[in-house]
Design a protein with these regions (language model features):
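Cellulosome-associated attachment modules in secreted, modular CAZymes
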Residues: 269-337
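C-terminal subregion of chymotrypsin/trypsin-like serine protease catalytic domains
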Residues: 16-36, 54-70, 159-164, 169, ...
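Chymotrypsin/trypsin-fold serine protease catalytic domain
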Residues: 106-195, 219-224
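Bacterial N-terminal signal peptides
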Residues: 1-11
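A conserved glycine-rich beta-strand in the N-terminal activation segment of trypsin-fold
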Residues: 38-61, 86
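Catalytic-histidine neighborhood of serine endopeptidases
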Residues: 59-61, 65-98, 108, 121-128, ...
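A structural micro-motif recognizing beta-strand termini
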Residues: 43-45, 103-110
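Acidic glycine-/aspartate-rich tracts in secreted/extracellular proteins
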Residues: 69-75, 106-111, 132-137, 171-175, ...
Length: 337
């Protein structure tokens, strides 16, 4: 499996979604043994007015991690639970072949985030995969019309819907972790067996450790077995002989190889929420007041701009004396864990 790593990289700007078997599609209302929806974000590569092309994972109140190959820059946007966040800066891993970057969000102050899985024993672990993008389309059978299903087409457009599935880590190398898309009750299939498809690159592979969900991988690509080119479909059996098991591969950036680098880039986590801390340094000071002043008397605050970049504390749609009062109450507070 490791030999196909270079071949399963999708073209620049492409990303992934999630496809399940019809009998394995989870009920997201009743399936609670998984990470919170709020730890996955939509990556909007080209900013306002452009559909997204990927996903990201929240790893700190003001930081997400994602892959390099879906492109974008500081003009890109991140949407988490319907709220749009702008970007302060992006730092890609210094090694070119490492498909990983850290993104600093502007005044996000998110309460839901995950730690990095840094134990290098991923092989054999059950995982939960999450990301925005395309899902399962019509079944593929051979001969056509026979009902002998070997896979599914990808369906949907854009990355507006969050999907979750389960899988298992089958193998690892220094850069990546790997899984495959088994048929139900075949191979190492899991309860909600699924595979990434289109518009989910940067989405998370999560492993439960010590009672907490931790991010172990970032979705990067998929491949049919052998030399078969990806054709907007996912297979679990051979396309010319559905009696033969033929599971597609899926791959993710291995977070345990880069957890220390990620931790060195992001700021320390504050000891509880700090109202008015715009720059994420766990204190409310003149730097934060300068940020607040830039939004003073705005009347267009809403989820599309993170309520005027967090300055509309109430929030009621504008930045006024009520918000100034909130800022004053927390002046010079310091909350570093």
């Amino acid at each position: 499996m490791l030999a196909v790593a270079a071949d399963i990289f999708l073209t620049s700007g492409s990303a992934l979604g999630i496809v399940w078997h019809p009998e394995a599609e989870p009920n997201l209302v009743t399936w609670t043994d998984r990470p919170n929806d709020a730890v996955i974000g939509r990556w909007i590569r080209d900013g306002v007015g452009v559909k997204g092309n990927g996903s990201c994972v929240v790893v700190s109140p003001n930081y997400v991690i994602t892959t390099k190959h879906q492109l974008g820059d500081e003009q890109s946007l991140v949407i988490i639970e319907g709220i749009t966040y702008t970007i302060d800066w992006i730092e890609g891993h210094p090694e070119e072949e490492v498909d990983l970057r850290v993104v600093k969000l502007h005044s996000a102050n998110l309460s839901d985030y995950v730690a990095m899985y840094d134990r290098r024993i991923e092989a054999g672990e059950n995982t939960v995969l999450g990301g925005y993008g395309k899902g399962r389309g019509e079944p593929l059978d051979y001969p056509v019309g026979s009902g002998n299903v070997y896979g599914y087409r990808w369906d949907g457009s854009g990355n507006t819907t969050l999907h979750w599935c389960t899988n298992k880590v089958n193998d690892t190398d220094s850069l990546y972790i790997y899984g495959d898309f088994d048929g139900l009750n075949e191979g190492d299939s899991t309860i909600y067996e699924g595979i990434t498809a289109e518009y989910d690159s940067g989405g998370g592979w999560f492993i439960e450790s010590g009672g907490f969900w931790k991010v172990a991988g970032l979705s990067r690509g998929v491949a049919h077995v052998g030399e078969e080119p990806i054709d907007s479909s996912s297979w679990f059996r051979k396309n010319t002989d559905p009696d033969v098991l033929y599971p597609d591969y899926l791959v993710a950036v291995r977070i345990s190889s880069y957890a220390n680098w990620i931790e060195s880039v992001i700021d320390p986590v504050c000891d509880g929420p700090v109202v008015g801390d715009f720059n994420g340094d766990c204190s409310v000071d003149v730097f934060d007041f300068t940020e607040f002043a830039e939004n003073w008397l705005r009347q267009d605050c809403g989820p599309d701009n993170n309520y005027c970049q967090g300055s509309d504390f109430e929030p009621d749609g504008d930045v006024d004396l009520d918000d100034f009062g909130v800022m004053a109450v927390h002046w010079l507070e310091y909350h570093l864990d």
